[in-house]
């Protein structure tokens, strides 16, 4: 009997360590697929330069139930003439969205690199294993442990879709430290309120919640991405504004299937 009690306590401790970095998911379900068109500002003209597709399915990771989320971006011939872009991002999270694994394989220009992250949660902490393969093919490894939760660009996307905006005020900031293979950024999400957004590739309009992803570097705040997500239970991103070091880009929703909730934010 004592053995079962010990095992039960261990199991509860193990699960609670995940729970502190997770969040209840009410926004999406397994089988959601979303598509986007990508646009780049070239000499003050917006050009369509590629596509992005995202899928989320229930899977498993090291024997436990997990969400598997992937994002694939592909530039077209117009962009290839200026800057080759082939990115594939993969993320595994627990069913309550605590991150477990992240990988980014990216060809950007003449540079190809890989970022990998593994997450474990010993004693309620967040243990992070980082692996980098740089453009020269060199491998770098690092391990560290934190009392606070650490995320990546995919797991933060899933987490942000489940925020309760009714409890937020314009200007509120939500700390969100983001890791890649070599660094952890001092970053946060800022809530900017509600607005209507028209798609560039159609006449569809959506009532959206607006968030900015901001990173502090060299003593300055830098807005890297502005998210427009539907003001309904799906919290589906319909537009992203990306502020890049070499210009600006936008992504607009083109289609979706497998949503968990009714799309009630569409403006007629």
Predicted regions and their residues:
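Sec-dependent N-terminal signal peptides
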Residues: 4-13
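Active-site/ligand-binding surface loops and adjacent short beta/alpha elements
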Residues: 124-180
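Solvent-exposed, charged interface segments at domain starts and junctions
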Residues: 4, 20-30, 119-127, 131-139
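Sec/Tat signal peptide C-region and signal peptidase I cleavage site
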Residues: 15-19
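Low-complexity, intrinsically disordered regions enriched in charged/polar residues
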Residues: 12, 147-150, 247
